[in-house]
Amino acid sequence: MGGVHKTIERQRSSPMTSLLIAIHVLAAVLLMGPVMITVSAYQSQMMKAKDGDAKALGAATTLHRLTSQYGPISAIVLVVGIAIFLTNLSAFGSQGRFHISILLSAVAWILLIAMIIPRQKKTLAALESGSKAVDFAKEKKQLSMFGGIFNLLWIITALLMFL
């Protein structure tokens, strides 16, 4: 057993902590997985849609909808993680990896809300209206960069949980 499990074994955890950990893990799997995929897949569909592919426009629309709906809800992973941390400070408070995980999760979530979702929304609006005002090549690079950073932050966070 690794990470969180070792920490909890050292310290008797309350049923509330166990419940919060279960919610945290389920939320991470059910919410973060889809968001990580959608922020990675949107750009290629956007570029195909720019060239007139109607199916790609539908796919880009669906990917953006998933990102913009699951993304904000995914804050539950961070909120529950903080709740776990605060309900058992004696077990988690002295371990820097949990501090780092909370920080990385917050940065990833802010990146999603402030940079990724607005760019997807802007490019999708341009695709739907046929506007040529958007530099799609530049937006693809930006979305790929921010999506890659977002995914890397979550992967590092997940690894820290199992150290």
Language model segments and positions:
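Residue-identity detector for glycine
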Residues: 2-3
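Polytopic transmembrane helical bundles with strong interfacial aromatic enrichment
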Residues: 8-163
